[in-house]
Swiss-Prot record:
This is Cysteine-rich venom protein. PROSITE patterns: CRISP_1, CRISP_2, SHKT. InterPro entries: Allrgn_V5/Tpx1_CS (IPR018244), CAP_dom (IPR014044), CAP_sf (IPR035940), Crisp-like_dom (IPR042076), CRISP-related (IPR001283), Cysteine_rich_secretory (IPR013871), SCP_CRISP (IPR034117), ShKT_dom (IPR003582). It comes from the Eukaryota.
Length: 238
């Protein structure tokens, strides 16, 4: 989801209150900026309310960053097609922001997160129809790989793109982007400052794999092939 009018208005307010920033200095090609982008995301994921029991810690992914850069350079100001948002077998989500002036990455990520003012856990957007998809992607529990890029499309148009793998905003689950509960309750032995560090790196092909696994279907070969996460990722965040 994207709503440039809302995000542009917010970006303009943030820019006016924070002064100018050198666009080149915020390049996501720089290692220190990559670390800051990841740090900002993890800080926000750690601070969700209600707290999350299964929120994975994010890390930078160069392939996702390359995909984000290639798309940003097109200056199309629309979401990239899913076929251009993959890292290995993972399908990735995407957040965009357009600004009339350059912004520090911390402000960009915060702008996405601030949609939480119109989000109620377990209910979703409130009032109904409010734009909250950028927020829910930032805090989607399973999105653990992150790559971002920005481009100056014109003197008054700057585009910021982040891709998240695996993708969030799964249809039917947007109101619960994570499981609420005590921080790290689902990963007590793999927790760093409230974030889980034990992701399952396998992906199920079907949405009902978990229920099938609970019925001891993992003894069957087709199940092992189509539901590897549910069958093999014990004590991991799936």
């Amino acid at each position: 989801m994207i709503a440039f009018i809302v995000l542009l208005s917010l970006a303009a307010v943030l820019q006016q209150s924070s002064g100018t920033v050198d666009f080149a200095s915020e390049s996501s090609n720089k290692g220190e900026n990559q670390k800051q982008i990841v740090k900002k995301h993890n800080a926000l994921r750690r601070s969700v309310k209600p707290p999350a029991r299964n929120m994975l810690q994010m890390e930078w992914n160069s392939r996702a960053a390359q995909n984000a850069k290639r798309w940003a350079e097109r200056c199309s100001f629309t979401h990239s097609p899913p076929s251009l948002r993959t890292v290995g077998k993972l399908r990735c989500g995407e957040n965009l922001l357009q600004s009339s002036q350059p912004l520090p990455w911390s402000k960009v990520v915060q702008a996405w997160y601030d949609e939480n003012k119109n989000f109620v856990y377990g209910i979703g957007a409130k009032p109904p129809g409010s734009v909250v998809g950028h927020y829910t992607q930032v805090v989607w529990y399973k999105s653990r790989l992150l790559g971002c890029a920005s481009v100056k499309c014109s003197p008054t148009k700057y585009l910021y793109v982040c891709q998240y793998c695996p993708a969030g905003n799964i249809i039917g689950s947007q109101a619960t982007p994570y499981k609420s509960g005590p921080r790290c309750a689902d990963c007590p032995s793999a927790c760093v400052k409230g974030l889980c560090t034990n992701p399952c790196k396998r992906e199920d092909d079907y949405s009902n794999c978990k229920s099938l696994a609970e019925k001891n279907k993992c003894m069957e070969e087709w199940m092992k092939s189509k539901c590897p996460a549910s069958c093999f990722c014990h004590n991991k965040i799936i």
